[in-house]
Amino acid sequence: MSKPIQMEKGVKYRDADKMALIPVKNMPSEQKEVLRKPDWMKIKLPADSQRIQDIKSAMRKNNLHSVCEEASCPNLAECFNHGTATFMILGAICTRRCPFCDVAHGRPLPVEAEEPKKLAKTIADMKLKYVVITSVDRDDLRDGGAEHFANCNREIRELNPHIKIETLVPDFRGRMDVALDLMKDNPPDVFNHNLETAPRLYRKARPGANYKWSLQLLQKFKEQHPNVPTKSGLMMGLGETKEEIVEVLKDLRAHGVTMLTLGQYLAPSRHHLPVERYVPPSEFDELKEIALELGFTHAACGPFVRSSYHADMQAQGIEIK
């Protein structure tokens, strides 16, 4: 029997190194014929600009991270050019190793106590009116990082009293009640937690996560804060059926969720889960209509939609595709 890999604290494991650490072995993209992108998935990326460099410089200066960079989001250039970014707190190393995600896995460094203040000042310097805060999973922390989320919300509002905050949280596995209690006095304006895919695909795509647990997290937060909208997102193209997605939408509505994002999964590398199919825009349109019929007040559905893509516009109900 081979010895388990001894991970060094603070070292990022990515691509093949990360996939090698996943107990549930999946067929990686490198062993399959890679699907060619259809025309609707081909876009011209905006050129590099001073605005993009300014945002990156502000991040580096304060030792902050964006999920845009860490997860290799295809919308990075567009969002940075518009002066928006999704900040990723609690470091850039995740304790989970989901094979669809490009965020590094490993043993995280200790939480930086000054991060909330640095984050608040950076947001003030950028003159943002709407901000999305997300994080890596921190299963190494007793509260899963919940108190740090609360501290960030508090510090951001102290320096930016008119800002709107959306938090995209992990599942706080095994510590949900503790986490919700720690965050109750500093809730966001929108509470987001992504289900990512249909429950049948959890073992393959979200090892370590639990579909029902995630639904309960969304429901319990809503019960605690009935006036704060809850939101969730799903990827298409991992092997799910349209019928399975509709059932997930029904589950979300049954648990009080009113905001939805649906987007096309793109494999970050040949080592990640392969794209099983490219979902045509017309199918996203159909699912949006179904979502609205089910009672979602906001539904951003389209190939390039991501959970925090134009989140400020999503919150206003402006159509996003």
From Swiss-Prot:
Q: Which PROSITE patterns match?
A: RADICAL_SAM
Please classify the protein's predominant subcellular localization into one broad category. Answer: cytoplasm
**Can you quote the record's cofactor note?**
Binds 2 [4Fe-4S] clusters per subunit. One cluster is coordinated with 3 cysteines and an exchangeable S-adenosyl-L-methionine.
**Binding of [4Fe-4S] cluster 1, residues:** 68, 73, 79, 308
* UniProt-listed Enzyme Commission number(s): 2.8.1.8
Q: What keywords is this UniProt entry annotated with?
A: 4Fe-4S, Cytoplasm, Iron, Iron-sulfur, Metal-binding, S-adenosyl-L-methionine, Transferase
Residues forming the Radical SAM core domain are 80-297
Q: Is 4Fe-4S among the key words of this record?
A: yes
Oxidoreductase listed as a keyword: no
The places in or outside the cell where this protein is found are: Cytoplasm
Report the Pfam families cross-referenced here: LIAS_N, Radical_SAM
Q: Which reaction does it catalyse?
A: [[Fe-S] cluster scaffold protein carrying a second [4Fe-4S](2+) cluster] + N(6)-octanoyl-L-lysyl-[protein] + 2 oxidized [2Fe-2S]-[ferredoxin] + 2 S-adenosyl-L-methionine + 4 H(+) = [[Fe-S] cluster scaffold protein] + N(6)-[(R)-dihydrolipoyl]-L-lysyl-[protein] + 4 Fe(3+) + 2 hydrogen sulfide + 2 5'-deoxyadenosine + 2 L-methionine + 2 reduced [2Fe-2S]-[ferredoxin]
Q: What InterPro entries does the database record attribute to this sequence? A: Aldolase_TIM (IPR013785), Elp3/MiaA/NifB-like_rSAM (IPR006638), LIAS_N (IPR031691), Lipoyl_synth (IPR003698), rSAM (IPR007197)
Q: Which cofactor does it need?
A: [4Fe-4S] cluster
Under Gene Ontology molecular function, one entry of this record is: lipoate synthase activity
Cellular component per GO, a single term:
cytoplasm
Pathway named in the protein's UniProt entry: Protein modification; protein lipoylation via endogenous pathway; protein N(6)-(lipoyl)lysine from octanoyl-[acyl-carrier-protein]: step 2/2
Which residues of the sequence carry a binding annotation for [4Fe-4S] cluster 2? 94, 98, 101
Q: Supply the SUPFAM superfamilies for this chain.
A: Radical SAM enzymes (SSF102114)
Q: What family is reported?
A: Belongs to the radical SAM superfamily. Lipoyl synthase family.
Q: Which PANTHER family match?
A: LIPOYL SYNTHASE, LIPOYL SYNTHASE, MITOCHONDRIAL
> What NCBIfam families would the database entry show?
lipA, PRK05481.1, PRK12928.1
Q: What is this protein called?
A: Lipoyl synthase
